[in-house]
Amino acid sequence: MAVKEIKYYAEAREKIMAGVDTLADAVKVTLGPRGRNVVLEKSWGPPTVTKDGVTVAKEIDLEDKFENMGAQMVKEVASKTSDVAGDGTTTATILAQAIYRAGSKLVSAGHNPMALKRGIELAVAAAVRELRNMSKPTKDQKEIAQVGTISANNDVAIGDIIAEAMNKVGKEGVITVEEAKSMETTLEVVEGMQFDRGYVSPYFVTDPERMEVVLEDPYILINEKKISNMKDLLPVLEQIAKMGAPLLIVAEDVEGEALATLVVNKLRGTLKVSAVKAPGFGDRRKAMLEDLAVLTGGKVVSEDIGVKLENVSLQDLGRAKTVRIDKDNTTIVDGAGARSAIEARVKQIRAQIDETTSDYDREKLQERLAKIVGGVAVVRVGAATETEMKEKKARVEDALNATRAAVEEGIVPGGGVALLRCLPALEKLDLHGEDAFGVKIVMRALEEPVRQIANNAGHEGSVVVQQVKQGTGSHGFNADTEVYEDLSAAGVIDPTKVVRFALQNAASVASLLLTTEAMIAEKPKKQKPAPAMPGAGMEDMY
């Protein structure tokens, strides 16, 4: 069994502080519009350049096991804030460092860490209430663009693209970020329901120049199983031929005799028809076919519910205004489903999103929801080099997360001012003894983001903090223009959700560290020197 090494009391706290400082000092240089980049060495490929706090934090592992424990705990603050709010990781790290530093001094001076923890929790609860009172909902696309711009390190183009994407697909829509093949950053919006299945045969193409199938006002047959026997398909094809309308077949697969007959009839001009494979696999495929049926007002042909393909009538088929199919994707625009049925389906998917514990399932459910209600927007990020593209893509993802958070819970003044404006609420807390010291720890920590933003801009942090404290509302220091002004009017705003989670997560981990009095780690094993190589009887040879 491995031998353990134990550190107690002041020695343990010093080790934690060293680890916290090492990680936080590397992360906090990135804060604010004048924050610097951090270069990360990779085991393969070029180094990564980033200004994202959580990316820097995740790269840090320290040689000293006790210091590393402190660093890993603060890394957890950044990761948790990133997972839940999507941004604010640097702020969270700075707050955790400030709370632990002030608290550990008081513990060393003889204060009770459990009472300090209680005071910290009461102070954070009061600050969160004040943030919620301060918060305002996002009014328009301009404010969403401002949030995105601030989060993307003052890149106005990124802010505008994300605001446009949010405007096009709504807050329920899915916005994905991909690497472009050119130097331009562009936005592509897919309206309607799109899934990643193309035509089964290129013979179905109606636009040879673009290699696309375009069907106007088609009927849509949704079949759960494979279709290979023409006899099963014949009754519905006869009804469609009489109507003279186009037909889209969505099935697990269309093959053999059935596919050959469809292709021949399409080439002769007897039928306007196309076939695509059903999206997804297993239970997810069933759910997506049901979504498609609800959206188009049709029914899923499935033997599970006693419906056979040969018995299908036109009433069982879905309708849509337009269907576009290329070799990779199918897009269905303006499905004819009943509004009430679509709303019921949306409500059901939202309930599943709330209930699921799997991040993967939640992501897939949100994609399904977006396809029914909003649509999908793709931001294609372009840059001159691969290194720049990766850095820019990370900033776009940060900005996207921040704008979603802003739409969800509203916005507060940026630049660390919102946290400073919580100080009067903390001063009003009527606490005595050790609890009051816990509140003072948080009050000191709330100044730290403004101080660090000013330091990174080349100003004296303490002077800036005092100046901002004398103001009211959203009056603060704009580190980009280096002037004191109304930050909300200047477009320097933060999502309430991001600021709230940064404070709550920082206080949670820092107060846990404060109550630590012993640390246990595996003792490093002494490496035995390798034995000398034998001379093999050749010592005297030169």
UniProtKB/Swiss-Prot annotation:
Together with its co-chaperonin GroES, plays an essential role in assisting protein folding. The GroEL-GroES system forms a nano-cage that allows encapsulation of the non-native substrate proteins and provides a physical environment optimized to promote and accelerate protein folding. Keywords: ATP-binding, Chaperone, Cytoplasm, Isomerase, Nucleotide-binding. Belongs to the chaperonin (HSP60) family. GO terms for biological process: protein refolding. It holds the Pfam family Cpn60_TCP1. It catalyses: ATP + H2O + a folded polypeptide = ADP + phosphate + an unfolded polypeptide. This is Chaperonin GroEL 2.
